[in-house]
Design a protein with these regions (language model features):
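N-terminal nucleophile
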Residues: 2-226
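A short amphipathic alpha-helical interaction element
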Residues: 220-259, 270-275
Length: 275
């Protein structure tokens, strides 16, 4: 087998109600997240793999931005590529349409599957079960897009995965102004570049990401009544702080602090743990 093949399995998907597009990927390849996943809010997502053509990422997004469908985008990318027989690509467009392409010279097992709002594909797999697990898990799960993508990735590995083993994994999710301080479109961008169990490590990082940058719905915040306010002041004093915002900033929880009439239960939990 020639060097340079991005032997992998991936799923590209969207949550139109949330305005999110994303890609999850795992491979026996160093730093797969630097090559395979591409996404842009309002345009779509692309996964480029096998003997990956990295240009499929930006060029695919440009086509999607113009209003091309997922299938039209795949057709245009592969038609212009003399190496298409070795390429594999999955695309989801702005309307949730999906398309996947597997070149005739991709190493077995190789193939893909599409459904409402997702494209799943892989090459050099133990069997087709991996792609089926990606698709069926995505269809069967609910909740945030990032969590559905991670669940699909784990199911793909449990079904066999890349027949060469594991090395790296990545998760990319975009949403307009959904990123840090609402000044970025990158909601989640996590990469495990070299690890014996990259999917488990990616799941661990996602949990940390949600702690630091996740958002508890405001209606689940706890009112700062007299008793709770006194507890918070006491906890802060014990740590040497007067302001919850000051402590949260140093604890990397400032995205979860807003006003002084209520407190995010995650912040309260971490404050109690810090005492």
């Amino acid at each position: 087998m020639a060097d340079g093949v991005v032997a992998t399995y991936s799923i590209v998907a969207c949550d139109l109600a949330a305005g999110q597009w994303g890609v999850a990927v795992q491979s026996k390849f160093l730093a797969v997240g630097s090559v395979v996943p591409w996404a842009e809010p309002g345009a779509g997502g692309v996964a480029t793999q096998s003997y990956a053509n990295p240009r499929y990422g930006p060029e695919g997004l440009a086509l999607l931005r113009q209003g091309r469908s997922a299938q039209e985008t795949v057709d245009a990318l592969t038609a212009a590529d003399d190496g298409r027989a070795q390429r594999q690509v999955g695309v989801v467009d702005a309307k949730g349409g999906a398309a996947t392409f597997t070149g005739a010279e991709c190493h077995d097992w190789a193939g893909g599957r599409t459904g409402a709002g997702y494209a799943a594909q892989g090459n050099i797999l133990v069997s087709a079960d991996t792609v089926d697990a990606l698709a069926e898990t995505f269809e069967a799960t609910s909740g945030p897009l990032a969590e559905r993508l991670l669940a699909s990735l784990a199911a793909g590995q449990a079904a066999g995965g890349d027949r060469r083993g594991q090395q790296s994994a990545a998760l990319l999710v975009v949403e307009r102004d959904g990123g840090y301080a609402m000044l970025s479109d990158t909601l989640v961008d996590l990469r495990i570049d070299d690890h014996e169990r990259p999917i488990e490590e990616l799941q661990r990082l996602y949990e940390a990401h949600e702690l630091l940058f996740g958002k508890t719905p405001r209606d689940r915040w706890l009112p700062l009544d007299e008793e709770l306010r006194a507890e918070v002041r006491g906890l802060l004093a014990g740590l040497g702080y007067e302001s919850l915002a000051d402590w949260a900033g140093l604890a990397n929880l400032k995205e979860r602090v807003d006003g002084d009439d209520a407190i995010d239960p995650v912040v309260l939990r971490e404050l109690r743990r810090a005492k």
